[in-house]
């Protein structure tokens, strides 16, 4: 149990080139990222995800593990992230994409054929409702408030200290 002063080089070789291209992306500066292949997140919807080893696991200067432990944990982290992600997408991507497609198709249909016609109908009816409401206010509510105000304005209180 001694202090190892040499910095070790960490390299991880994988067969899938597209994965190794994306493992060193600087998410803080999306302009530096130029993907020669197809961009699967063109609108940067998931740019907030930090899944790099250094973003998740960090050892302060005062507490360092052995370099071999650090290298092995880094390699295991990257490999398990790669394998588990691929495994989960094989079984979940197609059913979840199907469910999301059904959900968004249903929401789009409801919005287009029910919600927007209802909103437009309400907006068309509102000017006449506004005219009727103004008439009701002028005929019923304004005289009522005026008479209540006059009644309370004639009340006077006198306090005496006995």
Curated annotation (Swiss-Prot):
Modification comment: Phosphorylated on serine and tyrosine residues. CAV1 promotes phosphorylation on Ser-23 which then targets the complex to the plasma membrane, lipid rafts and caveolae. Phosphorylation on both Tyr-19 and Tyr-27 is required for insulin-induced 'Ser-727' phosphorylation of STAT3 and its activation. Phosphorylation on Tyr-19 is required for insulin-induced phosphorylation of MAPK1 and DNA binding of STAT3. Tyrosine phosphorylation is induced by both EGF and insulin.
Matching InterPro entries: Caveolin, Caveolin_CS
Highest taxon of source: Eukaryota
Sites bearing Phosphoserine, chain numbering: 20, 23
Annotated positions of the Phosphotyrosine modification: 19, 27
Intramembrane feature ranges: 87-107
Short name of one Pfam family: Caveolin
Keywords, ordered alphabetically: Cell membrane, Cytoplasm, Golgi apparatus, Membrane, Nucleus, Phosphoprotein
Record GO biological process: basement membrane organization; caveola assembly; endoplasmic reticulum organization; endothelial cell proliferation; insulin receptor signaling pathway; mitochondrion organization; negative regulation of endothelial cell proliferation; negative regulation of skeletal muscle cell proliferation
Membrane topology classification: Peripheral membrane protein
Its job: May act as a scaffolding protein within caveolar membranes. Interacts directly with G-protein alpha subunits and can functionally regulate their activity. Acts as an accessory protein in conjunction with CAV1 in targeting to lipid rafts and driving caveolae formation. Positive regulator of cellular mitogenesis of the MAPK signaling pathway. Required for the insulin-stimulated nuclear translocation and activation of MAPK1 and STAT3, and the subsequent regulation of cell cycle progression.
PANTHER family noted in UniProt: CAVEOLIN, CAVEOLIN-2
Official protein name in the record: Caveolin-2
């Amino acid at each position: 149990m001694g202090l190892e002063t040499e910095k070790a080089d960490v390299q991880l070789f994988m067969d899938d080139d597209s994965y190794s291209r994306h493992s060193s992306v600087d998410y803080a500066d999306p302009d530096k990222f130029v993907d020669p292949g197809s961009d699967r997140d063109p609108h940067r919807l998931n740019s907030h995800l930090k899944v790099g080893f250094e973003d998740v696991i960090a050892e302060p200067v005062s507490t360092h593990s052995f370099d071999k432990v650090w290298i092995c944990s880094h390699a295991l982290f990257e490999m398990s992230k790669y394998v588990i992600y691929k495994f989960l997408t094989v079984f979940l991507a197609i059913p979840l994409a199907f469910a999301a497609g059904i959900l968004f198709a249903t929401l789009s249909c409801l919005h287009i054929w029910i919600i927007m016609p209802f909103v437009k109908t309400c907006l068309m009816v509102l000017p006449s409702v506004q005219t009727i409401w103004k008439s009701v206010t002028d005929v019923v509510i304004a005289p009522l408030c005026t008479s209540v105000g006059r009644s309370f304005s004639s009340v006077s209180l006198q306090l005496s200290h006995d």
